[in-house]
Each structure stands twice: as C-alpha cells, then as structure tokens.
Amino acid sequence: PLLTMNRTRAEYDDLTPAERAVKLGRAGAPALGVTVRLSEQGEILARANMVMDGYWEQPDATADAIVDGFFHTGDGGGIDDEHYVSILDRKKDVIITGGENVSSIEVEDAVFSHPAVAEVAVIGVPHEKWGETVLALVVLAPGASADEAEIIEHCRGRLAHYKCPTVVEFRAELARTATGKLQKFKLRAPYWEGKERLVN
C-alpha cells in the first residue's frame, strides 16, 4: 500500500540543491489517512484503511506483521521533525553485535568506498561472545587487489570500531535475484545452518 509520499513544496524553492536532495532523499511524509510511527526498536509501523487485514491462511505471519492495528513494515528508520520518514535498513538486515545495532547498509557504504571494491554485501554471522559479528562479502573490481586487513582498516577510518567488519571474504559473485537485488538470506544461510538466530 501507499504509506508515504514526497510532494513538491514551495519552501524547497529557497533551498540549495544539496539541501533539497537531502529532503527529497527521504521516503516521504505519511500519505493522507496514514499514521506512521516507530516501535521502541526503531521499526517503522503504519496504520491505514488500505493496509491489509492479514496474510491469506497464514495466522502466525499475520500475528507477527499486524500488532494493535499497526503493520510492521520490517524497515528500520526514523521520523524527522517534519514527519518525513527515512528508511535506514531492513530490520532483518540489522546486525546486533555485543548489544549494539549495526546497519548493514552503513557498513556496505564504507566498504564500497574502497576503490578496489566492485560489489559488497554485509551480513551478521554467529559469534560466541558477541552473538553476531560483522562479515563483509566482497567482489573486487577487475584487475584490482585488496586484502582483508586493508578493507577493515579502510572502514576504521569511516566507522565506529564496533561497526567495522571483523571478517572479509572475497567472492567471484554474490547471490542476486533476476532483477539484481542481493539475496542476503541466501548469503547468510550457510553461516547459520544448525544454529538458531536469537539475536534478531
């Protein structure tokens, strides 16, 4: 359903292109008739007449998705003082390491800024002490070279220490859908086989 929308606003006319880009880069303000709020965990929740009543013949999935009339989108984000919504990461892609929440997208941006990196996916993998640790799966650009220590050090100059990958694995390719979207559930699966993911 349509939950938010970006509208052309007269006050944008006086903004610089950079300021306008920030405002228009958000997911938008709640559409007419939609109530949006954040859960205590930072998940975006929405309530509106057009939100589904539930999943067809899937009562457990419905109970997880709709609580107290609010649809749990699965997106983590924020709401600013203009009531505009920003989506920061998928809830299931947030890594919880040592009690700290780490956005996989933020780490991917840091890794991707290394000139040798062509593709990257960041996932949480089991760690005996911290619950999860940050793993970066990297595809290098043709003819480029980099090692694990170099990628980690690159990230340490851009991120808080706990957000940096502790492990970097190099791959020839990453699992994607036919439309090119990363399939993180497939990338995570081998690491969590035989383990219950209790931290997320």
Question: Locations of the language-model features?
Answer:
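Conserved ATP/PPi-binding loop(s) of AMP-dependent carboxylate-activating enzymes
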Residues: 26-33, 39-68, 82, 100
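Extracytoplasmic/periplasmic beta-strand context in beta-sandwich domains
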Residues: 3, 166-167, 185
